[in-house]
Amino acid sequence: MKLAKQVPLYYYLILLASTAIVIGIQWDISWHSTIGRDKLLSPPHLVVYIGGIICGLICTFIVFKETFFNKISEGVAFWGFKAPLACWICIWGMIAMLTSAPFDDWWHNAYGLDVQIISPPHIVLAMGIFSVILGSCILILTRKNLNPSNFIYDILYIYASSLILVQFSIILTEYSFANKQHSYEFYKVSSILYPFVLIAFKIPSKYKYAATYITSLYMIHRMLIVWILPLFPAEPLLGPIYREVTSYIAPYFPVLLIIPAIFIDIIYP
């Protein structure tokens, strides 16, 4: 408990906001699948954008603190301000996320409904989200290296890494449908991206089974979404309606990454 109190509050807040972003994205996909076209400020969009704004504001606070109150700051200088590189990554991510909002609204008005997750506005949004979560992860990792005796930072780092893995799995949704899992495309994409992410985020951790812990949190997160979303009522509002539904459509069961993660932990020193 004492070690937990030594961690500044904004580290917990930035992870909470990052979690809200990832949950909001999955809610938004379910919203599109269930209800149909949504407005710019629909509830899932608000959750995503507010999460990004909170992360950006926290990093802006760190920028001002390091610039004006830390005279020996060795952070990255930009326009006269100084802060850790992770903060600049987060702030850039927030700007990209907010830029994607009017871009996505214009895209829908110009070209109609999305037929797939990966579209130009969504790529901008995904880059912004990835930058925000990656910046949060690097920020925690930096603090972890400066405080190696405080294992709380290790736990926070593992959790932040799991959010990045969830984000990658969302991007690969259209390659991971049940019928696609018998195709060459699924194995090609999964075999390249997932091991890269797992090994990249396992290396900085001091835990032997870091990849297993990361994928365990990823599985828990994805399964909770699968179980919780259908508990809330929703119905299609965009015709033509070919299938009546009365609750949110849940995503497919997640890819079992925990199994290869165990082998990675055993093989990788």
Predicted regions located by residue number:
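Juxtamembrane membrane-water interface segments of multi-pass membrane proteins
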Residues: 1-12, 27-38, 57-85, 110, ...
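Alpha-helical transmembrane segments of multi-pass integral membrane proteins
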Residues: 13-23, 87-104, 127-134, 154-175, ...
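Membrane-interface helix-loop-helix junctions at boundaries between adjacent transmembrane segments
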Residues: 76-89, 102-160, 173-183
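Membrane-entry segments of alpha-helical transmembrane domains in multi-pass membrane proteins
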Residues: 6-15, 36-57, 81-89, 115-128, ...
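Hydrophobic cores of alpha-helical transmembrane segments in multi-pass inner/ER membrane proteins
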Residues: 46-64, 123-140, 188-206, 252-267
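Membrane-interface interhelical loops and short amphipathic "cap" helices
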Residues: 26-46, 103-123, 170-190, 228-246
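Anaerobic metallocofactor- and corrinoid-dependent redox/one-carbon enzyme cores
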Residues: 225-269
